[in-house]
Amino acid sequence: MWLQQRLKGLPGLLSSSWARRLLCLLGLLVLLLWFASSGARRAAGGLHLPSWARSEPGAAEPSACLEAATRAWRGLRDRGEAVPLGPGVPALVANGFLALDASNNRLWVTPGEREPAVTPDFVPFVQLRPLNVVAEAGEAVLLLREGLLRRVRCLQLGTPGSGPAAGVPGPASASGLSAGSGRDCVLLQEDFLAHRGRPHVYLQRIQLNNPTERVAALQTVGPTAGPVPKSFTSTLEKVGDHQFLLYSGRSTPLPSGLVHLVVVTSKKLVNRLQVAPKTQLDETVLWVVHISGPIHPQVLKSKGAKELKALQDLARKEMLELLEMPASELLQDHQYLWAQLFSPGVEMKRITDAHTPSGLTVNLTLYYMLSCSPAPLLSPSLSHREREQMEATLNYEDHCFSGHATMHAENLWPGQLSSVQQILQLADLWKLTLQKRGCKGLVKVGAPGILQGMVLSFGGLQFTENHLQFQADPEVLHNSYALHGIRYKNDHINLAVLVDAEGKPYLHVSLESRGQPVKIYACEAGCLHDPVELTSEPGGHTFSVMVTQPITPLLYISTDLTHLQDLRHTLHLKAILAHDEHMAQQDPGLPFLFWFSVASLITLFHLFLFKLIYNEYCGPGAKPLFRSKEDPSV
């Protein structure tokens, strides 16, 4: 009863101003004390884990380890050179002959240029299963400039019998280390790649850093999951000090009934990898894949043995050659060739509409197309004569790329790809598009030519007999982008579409000299001004965007100065306008029907108003404007 009376009197107490001030002061004091106590706890105890991490010992340590191990990826992601794996980003590593899905552990082999990819019943990569692990965190990323997939896993070792694989005895279980070191993490890094210079080779690099006080152990499963597939047989080959496994078999029959013979050699790996405390492990597993052409099952019995032996001899020879090489040299060779191949490209600087692909989409598409395209020019077995012929084809001024730009072709620059099979179909579509647009010579060269054609097509660049012309649509120049590494004669040209502070687009051209210097000139649309000689100065050269009537290319680049000077007399133009003037003519404002409707409504309103006034003062029964004095109502 007493408490009820006091509660009834509480609103009256708070109605006074001094009571409200006192209550606010007390609340502020409580907040200050809480912040001071939490700061003291942080200063005294260092980093405090969240409650969920403290309730599960060690749950946050792998995450912190992973954050430190992948910190260098942030800058690469910002520059569009690294793409985390996830939905819409298949884990593909390929070199035009081999294609491997690292996530689903599948292998595709392309027997020939016009033949579809074959999927042998063979699991390509080694699977690593850590022993005695109580917590784990991992992340994978495609490194576009290195041509590989990198997967990082941080493993927290537990006491023997606490991990998911505790039922498997081994040295790690017998280490007898105390639980006090269970909060340390082991860093496992795997690199997956299909070698760019050796089309039959793919590899998996395993690096394990064990800073703990206990032995770290990994169970290896592979290269086939479980027993060898029924379509394959395996033998252990011993040559000198080297041992490797030889797998022989056939692919699944094609719809036509034809089959392919497949031979795979693999470096032999122990069943369990062990890393002593405070040490590191660096192991590279190599594979060599050879495949025959399509064979009819009836012919397989008579010619199959001879064909299979020839494939086995090729695979043995290449595997022995690889085993004599340092693994680091093989990796460095791949990274160098891939960086050289990926030097041209497209850089998206500013996007103002929803139909233009993002920089991530462009770089990922270029990576996938390079991965699915062979590069015979990079093969070490290529003869000097064949190399010269391919270089001449690559530098030939073909009529590539004819037609409109592909910048807004969503089927060529898809925002998401769901599977490796979809990537292979996209590669076929790109090759067909380039061949139909005058780029047959570039497609024939392989990956360098296909990349050149894709860069040309993105911006609407086209080679003619005498010059290189930039024929982009003037209406899409509100997007800023740069095209790098365009081959012209012995030099590389960089062309960028930029926007100034007032929102007006302009062109920036720079030159990278390669080999014998050649004079190159450029002039904007119509060549109204004298051509400018392009040099390799760091600042480059800028050109204003001029639009002609009728529309012609926005920029001409040529080694023939006289040809550019003659263009102004042979184009036969009606007018040459600045870009903003052209856009003003293209978009004069609201349509005529709108203004006609507004004028009609205004006219009708005034006619209606005039009718009201007329009926009021001049119509039947209208009141007089002025009243006389004799009016009795006055």
Curated annotation (Swiss-Prot):
It comes from the Eukaryota. Keywords: Glycoprotein, Membrane, Signal, Transmembrane, Transmembrane helix. GO terms for cellular component: membrane. Residues 611-634 are cytoplasmic. Glycans are attached at N363. Residues 41-589 are extracellular. The chain crosses the membrane at residues 590-610. It is found in: Membrane. The keyword Cell cycle does not apply. InterPro entries: K2013-like. It is a single-pass type I membrane protein. Residues 1-40 form the signal peptide. This is Uncharacterized protein KIAA2013. It comes from Mus musculus. The gene is Kiaa2013.
